[in-house]
Amino acid sequence: MIRSLNFALRNCNKNILINSNKITINNGLLLKKNNFCTQSTSEVKVPTELVVQLRKKTQSPVQECKKALQASNNDMDGAIKWLLEKGKATAEKLKSRVSAEGIISVLVDSGSGKAVILEMNSETDFVSRGDIFRNLARDISKATLSNPISGGKLAENGILELDPTQVENIYPIKINITNEDGVAEEMTIKDSIVRIVSKLRENIVIRRASFIQPLNNNNNNSKSYISSYAHDSTSEKKDVGRLGSIVQFEYQGDCNNMNSLKEFANQLAIHIVSNSPSVVTVNDIPSSVLEECKNNNKNPESLYDDMVLYEQSYMYSPDHSVKQYLEILSEKLGIKNLSVKTFRRYAIGETAERV
């Protein structure tokens, strides 16, 4: 009997089934119910260097990398697929959790005349302040400006809106994720989120996104300039934060001082974050809001300070409204009809359901 067991132990592996008189050898235990033995994945020897390589590629925990390599018999591609499938299962388990923390990411592509503002949520502020989370938001923003966006609602002012029911339209877009070795790896936005969920163990979602489209200037030869701002007290790089805005300007003529125009554009993006307007002009106030004022015997002008950008006191020149300052600057820069074509302002959690 002992000789039979020793023979079985020497020859037992994942491909060979050894008859041992109805005694199974499994992780050193004798079981009397089966007539074969197999090698457990935990018995696969995993070289440390492979664990290190897989961790650098995927940023997954060390133990998960080891399990993936054991399950794939030390095949790197197989281990990566194993981690992705496990990550999908983890994401599925976590998706019912409330994610109301996170960041706003903003990005302008001056070459194409496009801009994006998106909200990416996590469960905790701790995760949202980490570089892994923030860098993913930056990578996703960059990818969305380099690819066509399907679905969504295109407003008259040229803003393309993706609400929570439509934002998954961007998930198939490919992005490049840089691993710890500095090597870029291509994957879909969806898979990149799955990977970070698997690593951070939190429900992570893209809540919404808005895109400024290139200016259609076929009619009046208008020019445009786009600026953005994200408020983050912990960083000098103002592209992610808990508040953010993108704003598009339109004008005619040749500007005699682009630096002054850029400075004003950046300052107005900050003004929008600070003062929370929701429309550009009085004429943009929704009819439903005006109707509500009428029903409540409330003067619509009482809304101007809070809602209308042009009617607000410009924070960098308080004696002037934003509209007045635009007129002054337009004359100073030698251009005509400097105006705000559109803007969007996001704040973390303002559309999320909290419990």
Curated annotation (Swiss-Prot):
Protein name: Elongation factor Ts, mitochondrial
Purpose: Associates with the EF-Tu.GDP complex and induces the exchange of GDP to GTP. It remains bound to the aminoacyl-tRNA.EF-Tu.GTP complex up to the GTP hydrolysis stage on the ribosome.
Organism listed in the record: Dictyostelium discoideum (Social amoeba)
Transit peptide, from-to: 1-46
NCBIfam families: tsf (TIGR00116)
UniProt GO MF annotations: translation elongation factor activity
Domain of life where this protein originates: Eukaryota
Pfam family, one: EF-Ts_N
